[in-house]
Amino acid sequence: MIFSTLEHILTHISFSIVSIVITIHLITFLVDEIVKLYDSSEKGIIVTFFCITGLLVTRWISSGHFPLSDLYESLIFLSWSFSLIHIIPYFKKNVLILSKITGPSAIFTQGFATSGILTEIHQSVILVPALQSEWLIMHVSMMILGYAALLCGSLLSVALLVITFRKNRQLFYKSNGFLNESFFLGENVLQNTSFFSAKNYYRSQLIQQLDYWSYRVISLGFTFLTIGILSGAVWANEAWGSYWNWDPKETWAFITWIVFAIYLHTRTNRNLRGANSAIVASIGFLIIWICYFGVNLLGIGLHSYGSFPSTFN
């Protein structure tokens, strides 16, 4: 009873803090001069990380097993992973871009986990025999950490595509408008061109940062995903007598791995970096959600214990 109450308190405290952090981010996005608010939001994410950590530890003690046995627990761990990705580079002082991704991601997963949709699986239950293994922590934690990093990196790539598209569109309109205006505006054209060049330079720098961070984060996530798949194969051989069974979850995890392997391969070609590789990462973003949520909607296969409640199947 005590652990259940403590878990309930920590869940809603962490969700409330993340909600406040998102509000602060929106305010600082509109008013750049409010620096103290941004610092408060960074500290809020750190507090959220420790709250979710306490929640996981509390659930671990109360259930007797590491809390990664169902969808609710994996969502909490996913939210914890987003918070971890946020605070690790915090001390580098140049993570404003990354924080814009990890903050909303944390509140989305935390909000969905604490919503009424998953009420039926909030309570911890006895592990099914297939999950009663030391491989549970290794396999599932690596997979969730991999998903979190890949989702963050993919969202950075999506942002890169949006900014690149807007930049190219404005360049197109500006080049056409410049020919018409040059006959009428005279010296004003030079002033407008200088302003446009400065703005274009800022966007180019932003695109480079997005490309840099998306590659770094996706590389980290790909490493976690690879370890998770390999450890899962070893665990599957011990539990079911086969390293690979082409279960829906396994199949989509393999597809996810292939997509991001293609992304990393495109990065080796200088001509395919930037927008081209970002397109592949954006496709990977959709594939991850199919693998993580879409397969759970089916509730079939060897991984059906991680599906939605029976009322949704």
Curated annotation (Swiss-Prot):
The keyword Transmembrane helix applies. It is found in: Plastid, Chloroplast thylakoid membrane. Keywords: Chloroplast, Cytochrome c-type biogenesis, Membrane, Plastid, Thylakoid, Transmembrane, Transmembrane helix. GO terms for cellular component: chloroplast thylakoid membrane; plasma membrane. It is a multi-pass membrane protein. GO terms for molecular function: heme binding. The chain crosses the membrane at residues 9-29, 44-64, 71-91, 111-131, 143-163, 217-237, 244-264, 278-298. One of its GO terms (biological process) is cytochrome complex assembly. Pfam families: Cytochrom_C_asm. May interact with Ccs1. PANTHER family: CYTOCHROME B_B6 PROTEIN-RELATED (PTHR30071:SF1), HEME EXPORTER PROTEIN C (PTHR30071). Belongs to the CcmF/CycK/Ccl1/NrfE/CcsA family. Required during biogenesis of c-type cytochromes (cytochrome c6 and cytochrome f) at the step of heme attachment. NCBIfam families: cytochr_II_ccsB. This is Cytochrome c biogenesis protein CcsA. It comes from Nicotiana sylvestris. The gene is ccsA.
